[in-house]
A protein has these predicted regions:
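Catalytic cysteine-centered active-site loop
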Residues: 182-196, 200-232
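Bacterial N-terminal signal peptides
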Residues: 1-12
Length: 289
């Protein structure tokens, strides 16, 4: 689907991206972030549609970027559009809708029957709203995409209320993702990995924490808690030792926690802390300060 490139051609990208004073925006539904400039490299993270990133280095058809959570890695040029020096960040001001459905379709017209969706975007995608017509029973919003093309989204798929969630609301949100597939390096509702899922839950509480589980456990924004006294909303960290953390989840009460795991039936699931291997591997418990 040529629309997925959203007008991002090499000719339009300019001679160099290696300028941290500039910004770029993701134009794919979800763009992989690689450990090195090759699709054969490990996928270490992702960035969703409309995410603003900072280009750090250019190499052939690749750009090293820094994402909003300070993660760095390599993305293909074709997944980005450069905003230019002093360019306006996408969906950073004005009337902005955020996708609240697990996924949402974008259309070229306010009609689901005439055309296939232009694009399917994940949970938390932010979109610039340009019109809220009263016709169509108020069901549709017109949005401006990062390539300056218009599109339409159904109002029921988005929210304008993005205030931080309570612990109870965060747990209710987490349970909406039960069964969503596990994806190594994933940070979207198309597939999370363990730390991508817990990072999203904490983000919805209004806090941006590091991307990886070991960095999360060491982060100063979390306070240590006794492992045998967790409270709902606390983060749990698992590994072979406190210095080798490889998994994370969120405690939801009554001896249970929710997490995204590749084990058993891979995906978001609820497990009991008393069960193995979790009881043996639990090495740290943390609480937002």
């Amino acid at each position: 689907m040529s629309f997925l490139l959203l007008g991002a051609t090499l000719a339009s990208l300019g001679p160099s991206w290696a300028n941290p004073a500039q910004n770029a925006v993701v134009t794919k539904s979800v763009a992989n972030v690689y450990s090195s400039p090759s699709e054969d490299a490990d996928v270490v993270s992702q960035a969703i549609f409309g995410t603003n990133v900072v280009p750090l280095e250019e190499r052939d058809d690749w750009v090293k970027v820094r994402t909003p959570d300070e993660y760095t890695g390599w993305m293909p040029l074709a997944a980005l559009r450069r905003l230019g020096p002093g360019g306006r960040l996408y969906a950073a001001a004005g009337r902005v809708a955020q996708v609240e459905s697990l996924t949402a379709n974008l259309y070229r017209e306010p009609d689901v029957t005439k055309h296939q969706p232009l694009l399917t975007v994940p949970f938390e995608t932010r979109l610039e709203v340009t019109a809220e017509p009263a016709d169509h029973e108020g069901r549709w919003l017109q949005v401006l995409l990062p390539d300056d093309h218009p599109a339409w989204i159904q109002r029921g798929d988005v929210t304008f209320d993005t205030k931080p969630l309570t612990i109870k609301q965060t747990i209710e949100l987490a349970e909406r993702f039960l069964g969503v597939t596990y994806l190594w390096g994933g940070t979207s509702s198309f597939g999370y990995d363990c730390s991508g899922f817990t990072q999203m839950l904490v983000r919805r509480r209004g806090v941006t924490m590091p991307r990886d589980a070991d960095a999360q456990a060491a982060w100063k924004g979390l306070a240590p808690v006794k492992r045998n006294k967790p409270k709902p909303g606390d983060l749990l960290f698992f590994g072979s030792s406190p210095d080798h953390i490889s998994h994370s989840g969120m405690y939801i009460g009554r001896g249970k926690f929710i997490h995204d795991t590749p084990h058993g039936h891979p995906g978001v699931q609820i497990s009991r802390l008393a069960d193995q291997p979790w009881a043996r591997l639990l090495v740290a418990c943390r609480r937002l300060k």
